[in-house]
């Protein structure tokens, strides 16, 4: 397995043959199933130096051969010793119980693993591990551990992991114009998007092909790119849409609004824009005209008629917005100041009287408390926090977001530390409390049927190491993690009952040793051994008969009895 190669990498680089010779001798002398993988690696890598006479004289070496079932290893061993096949056979006959004792250990340990729900869960994830490097825990380097024990206090965790982002102040009007233009172009595609949509506009426009831009899109294109005759679609696709020198100032962003605008600009540069950006601007901007315009963009309804909707009745709001979109988005209604009141009368006339209440006020939907905004100005935040605001929720709520400041512990630098922390708890505790999106959550409260949630919680590298170590405890080597690992464990138990694998492989590769093998099996004259090799002897009955005919050391009854055992009709 790969983790064994990395374990011995420093000695491999130094070509430390003495180390590997001693390492193999130690692992053979103190053999256990957990040594199978390491022994196999050392033999494959340094067989010319490490396969000494002492190794071939040790019973445990042949127990290893019985468990490994690896053709490449068999070839190496067979080339290293001309009589290893007979040595294996003799060791099996003399120390049969030693072989069976380790088989019993395999069965016990495999049954324990198959009863372990945690192990079964990780094996289901194994297809995701194929190209992953497995690593062990390094809790001494993880800030979420103290004296190799996980810290459980979230405030302490926050203090250790939080890193404030340095936002650069941007030119407010330039960013707002760019935001409106990009959002309007996105709406021109005619597609529907979630308020927190994170798809980049480049990909969307590549799929749609050229789109016809609305008047608003082209108007704001003129604001952002004066004297540029290219249509918004081709301008966005082919030209650079941002200019850091004009947008960024030399000052740090101080207020929450300045920080959010800086983040929005960085996202627009990556072609990402959504409705939540408009909502946040509406909440934080103090200009009434900008707030009004953002509201129109959010709902896609002229501002003059928005005042009839009130946030206190979600059913009404939903009814009216759908009603207006279905009946009056026709390029005729509310397009002329002279006809405005006539159009408004027609709209009102079609509204269900039970739904109508002129006192309704949509602006209070996103109205924010100045005190709350000031608290945000004073709060240290990072890009993770603003990202949560823009992408992790359908409805932007500053009060709710204030309580989610702990989510800021997530960033590229802390992601692995959190995953290592969660993985450690999962592998060592039942239903632990883990860190999920900046909050402490009971593991049982999360949907672990979702791979995206599982791998946002846990480290693939650590889970793979856990799986590798459990399989190594059985002496199992997995080359393809997409295979059915549970099936391999179960079939491994039955395969170990077949003691002829190495003998069959050796005789297939070298027919000249067949006579010697047959002779050795018969001469031991042990019923149990003859039964173990019954199929092998049946397949090579010619050599059996030849030997029995020529030997003078067996009586007529001995020969008859041996043939009866081979043919399965003895009493």
From Swiss-Prot:
Top-level taxon in the UniProt lineage: Viruses
Induction: Expressed in the late phase of the viral replicative cycle.
Disulphide linkage map: none
Positions in coiled-coil regions: none
Keyword annotations: Late protein, Virion
Annotated transmembrane regions: none
Keyword Cell wall biogenesis/degradation: no
GO cellular component: virion component
Keyword Acetylation: no
Localization of this protein: Virion
Primary location class: virion
Family: Belongs to the chordopoxvirinae E6 family.
Function of the protein: Late protein which may play a role in the virion morphogenesis and have therefore an indirect role on viral transcription ability.
Record's protein name: Protein E6 homolog
Source species of the chain: Fowlpox virus (strain NVSL) (FPV)
């Amino acid at each position: 397995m790969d983790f064994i190669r990395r374990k011995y990498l420093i000695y491999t680089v130094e070509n430390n043959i003495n180390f590997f010779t001693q390492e193999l001798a130690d692992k053979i002398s103190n053999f256990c199933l957990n040594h199978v993988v390491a022994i196999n690696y050392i033999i494959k890598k340094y067989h010319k130096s490490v396969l000494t006479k002492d190794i071939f004289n040790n019973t445990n070496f042949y127990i290893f051969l019985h468990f490994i079932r690896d053709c490449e290893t068999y070839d190496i061993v067979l080339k290293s010793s001309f009589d290893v096949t007979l040595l294996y056979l003799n060791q099996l006959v003399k120390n049969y119980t030693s072989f069976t004792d380790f088989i019993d250990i395999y069965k016990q340990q495999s049954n324990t693993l198959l009863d372990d729900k945690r192990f079964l869960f990780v094996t289901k994830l194994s297809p995701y591990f194929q190209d992953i490097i497995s690593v062990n825990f390094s809790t001494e380097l993880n800030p979420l551990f103290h004296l190799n024990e996980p810290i459980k206090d979230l405030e302490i965790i926050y203090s250790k992991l939080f890193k404030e982002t340095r936002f650069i102040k941007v030119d407010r009007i330039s960013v707002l114009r760019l935001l409106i233009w990009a959002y309007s172009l996105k709406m021109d595609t005619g597609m529907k998007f979630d308020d927190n949509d994170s798809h980049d506009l480049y990909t969307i426009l590549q799929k749609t092909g050229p789109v016809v831009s609305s008047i608003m899109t082209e108007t704001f294109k003129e604001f952002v790119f004066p004297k540029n005759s290219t249509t918004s679609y081709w301008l966005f696709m082919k030209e650079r849409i941002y200019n850091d020198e004009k947008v960024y100032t030399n000052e740090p962003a101080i207020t929450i609004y300045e920080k959010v605008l800086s983040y929005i600009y960085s996202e627009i540069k990556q072609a990402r824009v959504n409705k939540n950006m408009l909502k946040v601007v509406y909440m934080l901007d103090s200009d009434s005209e900008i707030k009004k315009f953002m509201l129109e963009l959010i709902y896609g309804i002229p501002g003059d008629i928005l005042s009839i909707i009130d946030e206190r009745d979600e059913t009404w709001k939903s009814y009216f917005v759908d009603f207006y979109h279905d009946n009056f988005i026709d390029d005729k209604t509310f397009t002329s100041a002279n006809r405005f009141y006539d159009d408004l009368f027609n709209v009102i006339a079609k509204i269900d009287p039970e739904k109508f209440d002129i006192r309704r006020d949509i602006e209070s939907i996103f109205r924010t408390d100045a005190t709350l905004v000031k608290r945000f100005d004073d709060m240290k935040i990072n890009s993770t926090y603003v990202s949560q605001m823009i992408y992790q929720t359908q409805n932007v709520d500053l009060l709710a977001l204030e309580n989610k400041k702990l989510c800021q512990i997530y960033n590229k630098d802390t992601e692995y530390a959190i995953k290592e922390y969660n993985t450690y708890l999962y592998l060592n505790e039942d239903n632990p409390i883990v860190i999920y999106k900046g909050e402490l959550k009971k593991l049982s409260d999360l949907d672990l049927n979702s791979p995206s949630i599982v791998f946002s919680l846990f480290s693939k590298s650590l889970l793979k190491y856990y799986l590798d170590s459990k399989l190594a405890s059985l002496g199992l080597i997995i080359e393809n993690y997409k295979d059915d690992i549970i099936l391999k464990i179960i079939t491994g138990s039955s395969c170990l009952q077949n003691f002829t694998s190495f003998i069959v492989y050796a005789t297939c590769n070298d027919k000249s040793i067949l006579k010697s093998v047959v002779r050795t099996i018969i001469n031991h004259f042990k019923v149990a051994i003859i039964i173990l090799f019954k199929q092998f002897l049946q397949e090579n009955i010619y050599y059996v008969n030849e030997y029995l005919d020529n030997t003078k050391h067996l009586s007529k009854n001995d020969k008859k009895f041996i043939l009866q055992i081979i043919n399965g009709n003895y009493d």
